Amino acid sequence: MGIIPPGTPDTVDVTHLCPYDPAKAKALLADAGYGPQKPLTFALMTNTEKSVFNVIATVIKEQMARVRVTANIRLVDKITWMNTILQDAPWDLFVEDLLSLLTLDSNAFISTTPSAWNQARHTDTKVDDYYARYAREMDPLKRKAIAKEFQEFSADKLYWNTISGSPFYMVAQPWMKDYVYNAEFEVHYDRVWLDK
């Protein structure tokens, strides 16, 4: 868990900050006034772009049911999904992969405060500061430290959380030369040549 999926440069596993503890979850829900007489219900929207999205949404729904929370899955086409998340429309959470991250700041355009795509709708300029510090820092060790601090901050505030990236595979044989792996972000074969 974190703001970037495992395998992305400077990834830090922050799962320990949000351990799976159903008893504690039920207690927190009770403290917030939710229980059998007043269950917490939320909308979990996803789209039809990839078949794995509705599977992930179903897993989340089942996990929520274990702590007596109801997740109502709303499955829509990709265009409807985009139009909905870009507005203050009826959704609470969504499942999407947006793009496989190449760096921590690949998705800054959807999580900085001035962004029209600020999906968490937060106003915390510390997020902007983290991105700026990360982008300016050239020392790999200092950059990694900023990334760790930012991921821990984001998990604490729950501004953005990623459980995993979507399954995406590309295969290149050893005889395929000049192939560059860019995750799911871009797939280029225009400079590739075959070494016979």
Residue ranges and their predicted role:
Residues 1-12, 48, 52-61, 80-196:
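Detector for C-terminal structural segments
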Residues 22-43:
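Immediate post-signal peptide segment of exported/extracytoplasmic ligand-binding proteins
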Residues 39-49, 71-74:
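Short, well-ordered beta-strand elements
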